[in-house]
């Protein structure tokens, strides 16, 4: 069953209303990528989306609710795209090198080659440092993402799949963040893929 989408007054939205709300969230994400979370407000999103301040307030009510919606959108994208490769990850579990290669391919295709997604993901996580209202939704999605690959990590040989997933996740995140700031030529072949393979073998020692 699809989750019903509502506005700030808890009124269920029509399909058209839900689409308009999505457009406003996308506008907020563009601001986050371009200027950082601190630049997001009901007014700046209204300007970015060529909408009225009242319309943004109708859908979200507060900046906090708007930011939560932005986090939900980014994290949902990661869950959907990552979930699609879980069968490949589980199938590769008997071979750590192949397991690493699946993770590399996913991150290259969905994060490195889509820098706006990667930057938005990092920015909303950083926003959680200063904005406590975002922490519950970040925690919720973190558990969702970890649960998706728990079986694959166990099949790989991990004795503590949640901890090992977190270790690999944040290490990969750091590698990609470094590439975003200081791009390297042949990043995937000469740096990223070998590093991820070492990460995977390290959790099996």
Could you say what each language-model-derived stretch is?
Residues 1-19, 30:
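N-terminal intrinsically disordered/low-complexity leader segments
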Residues 17, 21, 71, 75, ...:
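Amphipathic, non-transmembrane alpha-helical scaffold segments
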Residues 20-29, 45, 70-74, 78, ...:
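Generic hydrophobic, amphipathic alpha-helix propensity
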Residues 23, 27-69:
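Helix-turn-helix
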Residues 69, 80-115, 168, 193:
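Hydrophobic alpha-helical connector segments
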Residues 79-80, 112-122, 129-156, 166, ...:
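Amphipathic alpha-helical packing segments from all-alpha helical-bundle domains
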Residues 107, 121, 125, 168-175:
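Short alpha-helical scaffolding segments that buttress acidic/His motifs in well-ordered protein cores
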Residues 135-139, 154-204:
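Hydrophobic/aromatic-rich alpha-helical bundle segments in the mid-to-C-terminal region
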